[in-house]
């Protein structure tokens, strides 16, 4: 069953809140490529940004990953997370290994991964 995109964004926001981040979401409408802003009390400004895609039938490719890198650069954000219910193309994964952006999504066993660490 496919997860509705807004519900998925809310689940992702709650996950980051439970793992110690202060979260801020955008109002409905154009989000500029960012679904959740992550903040740390000890760090001024936005510490990381999150883009969510509830795509089970599509793989996230290089284009949306590059776009998120562009937002990170334009907004001087040091870290990013791209979260999907589906998978990533090999080129998209390779691109994220070269920077501060992590691909997050389920592995073939249904476990969620953040970089090389699994979420249970």
What are these regions (language model features)?
Residues 1-120:
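Mixed-charge (Asp/Glu-Lys/Arg
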């Amino acid at each position: 069953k496919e997860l509705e995109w807004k519900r998925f964004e809310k689940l992702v926001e709650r996950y980051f809140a439970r793992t110690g981040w202060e979260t801020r979401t955008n109002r409905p409408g154009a989000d500029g490529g960012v679904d959740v802003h992550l903040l740390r009390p000890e760090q001024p400004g936005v510490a990381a940004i999150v883009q969510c895609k509830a795509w089970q039938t599509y793989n996230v490719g290089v284009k949306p990953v590059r776009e998120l890198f562009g937002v990170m650069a334009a907004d001087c954000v040091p870290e990013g997370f791209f979260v999907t219910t589906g998978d990533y193309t090999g080129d998209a994964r390779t691109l994220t290994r070269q920077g501060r952006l992590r691909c997050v999504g389920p592995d073939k066993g249904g476990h969620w991964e953040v970089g090389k660490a699994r979420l249970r």
